Amino acid sequence: MGMRMMFTMCLLVVLATTVISFTSDRASNGRNAAAKDKASDLNALNVRGCCSHPACRVHYPHVCYGRR
């Protein structure tokens, strides 16, 4: 192989790696946003004092675990 061919192959590998990385990152953004929204909702319940009310604590034990 000549130097031009090796350089071209190297550029092709770098380009392919960049494209794969970029598309997989964009695909995961939806999952990250959903997880962030759920965490925000749980934090809002905790901040509003849900864990101090027994009825609310029964419905959201995963938020109020160990709190009395």
From Swiss-Prot:
It comes from the Eukaryota. Expressed by the venom duct. Residues 52-54 are annotated as: Ser-Xaa-Pro motif, crucial for potent interaction with nAChR. Residues 1-21 form the signal peptide. One of its GO terms (molecular function) is toxin activity. The keyword Magnesium does not apply. It is found in: Secreted. Keywords: Acetylcholine receptor inhibiting toxin, Amidation, Disulfide bond, Ion channel impairing toxin, Neurotoxin, Postsynaptic neurotoxin, Secreted, Signal, Toxin. Pfam families: Toxin_8 (PF07365). GO terms for cellular component: extracellular region; host cell postsynaptic membrane. Its main location: secreted. The modification Tyrosine amide is found at Y65. Residues 22-48 form a propeptide. Disulfide bonds join C50-C56, C51-C64. The keyword Signal applies. The cysteine framework is I (CC-C-C). Alpha4/7 pattern. Alpha-conotoxins act on postsynaptic membranes, they bind to the nicotinic acetylcholine receptors (nAChR) and thus inhibit them. Belongs to the conotoxin A superfamily. This is Alpha-conotoxin-like Mr1.3.
